[in-house]
């Protein structure tokens, strides 16, 4: 069972598509670096919708997999 996405992952899922549309030949590693830098530049207020989205996913995950315990 996969862990639920965190706020960065929720945000980056949408942003990654935008970058790939603009630069289809860009390597995944470079896209990830850009996403990380852009996320760090966002204001906390801009992150709120993604934090809330991640929290919804976390709660759903807890309901769906009540006995789940992360084991790396």
Swiss-Prot record:
Bilayer-crossing regions: none
Cross-referenced PROSITE patterns: HMG_BOX_2 (PS50118)
GO terms under cellular component: nucleus
SUPFAM superfamilies for this protein: HMG-box (SSF47095)
SMART domains: HMG
Compartments reported by the entry: Nucleus
Top-rank lineage group of the source organism: Eukaryota
DNA-binding region coordinates: 1-69
Chief location bin: nucleus
Keyword field: DNA-binding, Nucleus
MF-aspect GO terms: DNA-binding transcription activator activity, RNA polymerase II-specific; RNA polymerase II cis-regulatory region sequence-specific DNA binding
Keyword Nucleus appears in the UniProt entry: yes
Pfam families, per database record: HMG_box
Any single GO BP term: brain development
The UniProt record lists the keyword tRNA processing: no
PANTHER family for this protein: SOX TRANSCRIPTION FACTOR, TRANSCRIPTION FACTOR SOX-12
Entry protein name: SRY-related protein ADW2
Organism encoding this protein: Alligator mississippiensis
């Amino acid at each position: 069972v996969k862990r639920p996405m965190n706020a960065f992952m929720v945000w980056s899922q949408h942003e990654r598509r935008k970058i790939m549309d603009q630069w289809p030949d860009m390597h995944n590693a470079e896209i990830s670096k850009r996403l990380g830098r852009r996320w760090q530049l966002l204001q906390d207020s801009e992150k709120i919708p993604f934090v809330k989205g991640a929290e919804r996913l976390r709660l759903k995950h807890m309901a769906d997999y009540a006995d789940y315990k992360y084991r790396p």
